[in-house]
Amino acid sequence: CGLEYAGHPGKDEFITNTGAKGQMDLTLHGKISNIPASEVIVTVDRQAPYTIRIRGRVDERVFFGPKLELWTEISTVPGSNTFTISDTLTNRGSEPQEFMLIYHANYGSPLLEKGARLVAAAERVAPFNDHAAKAVKTWDTYGAPKSGFVEVVFQIFPFADRQGRT
C-alpha cells in the first residue's frame, strides 16, 4: 500500500501549483493497490534452477503532484518453499517527494502455514497497538489459521544507510 500515503483515511493539506493551501482526501492505505500495472513481464530461466520472475510497473501520478514509479518483482524457484519480493521506487517528479510503503498481504496454505517465518533485516519491530504488543515476542512466526482471528500488526523499521536507504 502507498505510495504517497499509506495510513488511515483523513485529510491532508498541501501547497497547490498557485501557492495556495489546498486540501485532499486521503484514502485507506493510499492509491497504489487500486492502480493496475501498466507493464508486466514474466520470465522463466532456461537453465536450472528455472527461476520464475514476474515483474510489473505501477505509476502513481497526479497533475501538479507526485510522480512515483514502482517496479515490483516476485520470484521463486519451482519446488521451493520461498519467494522473494524486490521493489524499486523512483521519484519521476521535479520536486522531492515523501512516500510511505506498507507490505501486507493475505497468503494462505501452502505458502504460509503454522511455523512459517518472516525473515527481514529489521533494526526494530514495534507493535501497532496494545493487542499486537501481546504477540511481539513471536512477531516473525505465523500461527495456524484461527476462526475470528483479530489482526496483529507490527511496524518493521529496516536497517538503513546514512541517507535512510534500505
Label every model-predicted segment.
Residues 87-88, 105:
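Generic detector of well-ordered alpha-helical packing
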Residues 88-95:
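Asparagine-centered strand-capping/turn motif at beta-strand->loop junctions
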